[in-house]
Amino acid sequence: MTQSLQVKLLDPRFGDLWPLPAYATEASAGMDLRAALEAPMTLEPGDAALIPSGIAIHLDDPQVCAVILPRSGLGHRHGIVLGNGTGLIDADYQGPLLISTWNRGREAFTIEPGDRIAQLVILPIVRVSLQVVDTFVDSARGAGGFGHTGVR
């Protein structure tokens, strides 16, 4: 199933130098977001920066949200991850998408203009109403917390 997504191009390099965000394969869950930088940016170990994506989106459907996630290769190979873990974009937000980028690695890393540095995933939302209770019906796990189910 494909739905439309309103996108505003905030950087004129889209269309000429850079393609619009798109799914890389038929089964891709996310679309890559680019670093809409004017010049290369070097992140020293421990540094964080807000990097513009060059686009704004408007989901306009309260039953979906967007999340910005790291690209696995950048995180695994270079320690480049999102400074906020995951970026959550509400359906009524219309501003520019900024990517909180953090170098948790041991070496400086340079991001070039147009580099694909994160991915955008659209997800369904289930809204709930809270029901205050005194006790829960027993479950197999109960209140077992971190490590409760073991490693093996």
UniProtKB/Swiss-Prot annotation:
Q: What is this protein called?
A: Deoxyuridine 5'-triphosphate nucleotidohydrolase
Q: Does the keyword Transmembrane apply?
A: no
**Transmembrane recorded as keyword:** no
The molecular function GO annotations come to:
dUTP diphosphatase activity; magnesium ion binding
One Pfam family it belongs to = dUTPase
Pathway per the UniProt entry:
Pyrimidine metabolism; dUMP biosynthesis; dUMP from dCTP (dUTP route): step 2/2
Residue ranges that the Swiss-Prot or TrEMBL entry lists as coiled coil: none
Matches recorded under SUPFAM superfamilies: dUTPase-like
The organism named in the record is Xanthomonas campestris pv. campestris (strain ATCC 33913 / DSM 3586 / NCPPB 528 / LMG 568 / P 25)
- Keyword field: Hydrolase, Magnesium, Metal-binding, Nucleotide metabolism
Name of the gene this protein is made from: dut
HAMAP family, sorted: dUTPase_bact
Q: Which family does it belong to?
A: Belongs to the dUTPase family.
